Design a protein with these regions (language model features):
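His/Asp/Glu-enriched short active-site or ligand-binding loop at hydrolase and phosphoryl-transfer sites
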Residues: 115-129
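Short glycine/serine- and small hydrophobic-enriched flexible loop segments
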Residues: 173-174
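Short, acidic/turn-prone active-site loops that include or flank metal/cofactor-
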Residues: 8-10, 102, 122-126, 150-151
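Flexible, gly/pro- and Lys/Arg-enriched active-site loops
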Residues: 124-127, 145, 153, 165, ...
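Divalent metal-binding pocket/active-site signature
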Residues: 10-19, 23-114, 134, 139, ...
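Non-cysteine beta-strand/loop elements that form the S-adenosyl-L-methionine
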Residues: 5-6, 34-39, 141-151
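A generic structural motif
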Residues: 1-2, 32
Length: 174
């Protein structure tokens, strides 16, 4: 009952090349690989350059389309670019999860209309998570996926400690 997602996180795209994409695609043929991810854009850090991240994001969306696998999307401080690129690439046809969703209701509505699930984790318990709590109240329950992002983003009362699935009850209670 163990399955995998195969993809390159945006923070690792500076080292990505076509040979690695071919290797990822060959891995996606394995019956235990069920998604392409975690792929997307991360503008929190200055590197890798946004243009490099965008290039490989599109390339991995194309890989998901060709392998007929859903996607797991990473988007940090890149709401507009991520959404625009996903629309342009018709990512709604693939479906998947917006991992660690952290934007507001308007962006959530766009993703939900595309058929994506929203990943909700420990951040929803933070005092400054008002927008995310509004999203959780707005979104249909069947469109939410509980996540840990282990070992990161532990919920209150364990914020700053190592996260694990043992903390999911705090996310549910939020």
């Amino acid at each position: 009952w163990m399955y995998a997602a195969q993809g390159i996180h945006p923070s690792e795209t500076a080292e990505l090349d076509e040979e690695k994409i071919r290797w990822i695609e060959s891995c996606c043929a394995h019956e235990k690989v069920k998604a392409v991810g975690e792929i997307g854009l991360d503008y929190y850090w200055e590197e890798p350059d946004h243009s490099i991240q965008k290039k490989w994001f599109v390339r991995q969306l194309d890989l998901a389309r060709r392998t007929k696998l859903p996607v797991i999307i990473h988007s940090r401080d890149a709401a507009k670019d991520t959404l625009d690129m996903m629309k342009a690439e018709k990512a709604g046809d693939m479906g998947g999860v917006i991992h660690c969703f952290s934007y507001g209701k308007e962006i959530a509505r766009e993703y939900l209309n595309m058929g994506f699930f929203l990943g909700i984790g420990g951040v929803v318990t933070f005092n400054n998570a008002k927008k995310l709590k509004e999203v959780v109240e707005y979104a249909p329950l069947k469109s939410l996926v509980l996540e840990t992002d282990c070992p990161y983003l532990a919920p209150v009362p364990n914020r700053g400690k190592r996260n694990s699935s043992l903390n999911l009850t705090y996310v549910v209670d939020a």
